[in-house]
From Swiss-Prot:
Homology family: Belongs to the universal ribosomal protein uL22 family.
Cross-referenced InterPro entries: Ribosomal_uL22, Ribosomal_uL22_bac/chlpt-type, Ribosomal_uL22_bac/org-type, Ribosomal_uL22_CS, Ribosomal_uL22_sf
Domain of life, per lineage: Bacteria
Keywords noted in UniProt: Ribonucleoprotein, Ribosomal protein, RNA-binding, rRNA-binding
Any Pfam family hit: Ribosomal_L22
Gene Ontology CC annotation, any one: cytosolic large ribosomal subunit
Protein name: Large ribosomal subunit protein uL22
GO molecular function (one): rRNA binding
GO biological process: translation
Subunit organization: Part of the 50S ribosomal subunit.
Protein role: This protein binds specifically to 23S rRNA; its binding is stimulated by other ribosomal proteins, e.g. L4, L17, and L20. It is important during the early stages of 50S assembly. It makes multiple contacts with different domains of the 23S rRNA in the assembled 50S subunit and ribosome. The globular domain of the protein is located near the polypeptide exit tunnel on the outside of the subunit, while an extended beta-hairpin is found that lines the wall of the exit tunnel in the center of the 70S ribosome.
Length: 127
């Protein structure tokens, strides 16, 4: 009766997780996203655990969610997963007012960002 299910956007050997409305500027979030691109998930998790950036905690949660999606929803082997994509997008920007001297005002921008992580299963072929 209802609509047919939409075809899967990702290939069968990939899984995705999205973290929306992270309270950090996209530039700062991209610094941490660059850190994990192309790495095996075990190495990426270790890098995020020891990163001193505040947002690394949220990126780690998103990566763990992508790993769980791969394991539980798509039956992929966790040991063979690699971070295929980790990209950042802009979300909304809250605008605030800061009173300054002589009756002036300054605008404070509080940006938000979205993070998408795609993991792919890469099987090691026997050579």
């Amino acid at each position: 009766m209802g609509k047919a299910a939409a075809p899967r956007a990702l290939p069968e050997n990939e899984a995705k997780a999205v973290a929306r409305m992270l309270r950090v500027s996209p530039q700062k979030l991209n610094l941490v996203a660059q850190l994990i691109r192309g790495k095996k998930v075990a190495n990426a998790l270790a890098d995020l655990q020891f990163s001193r950036k505040r947002i690394a905690v949220e990126v780690r949660k998103c990566l763990e969610s992508a790993i769980a999606n791969a394991e539980n929803n798509h039956d992929l082997d966790v040991d063979d997963l690699v971070v295929k994509e980790a990209y950042v997008g802009k979300a909304l920007v809250l605008k605030r007012f800061h009173a300054r001297a002589r009756g002036r005002g300054a605008r404070i921008l509080k940006p938000f960002a979205n993070l998408t992580i795609v993991v792919r299963e890469v099987r090691a072929e026997a050579a």
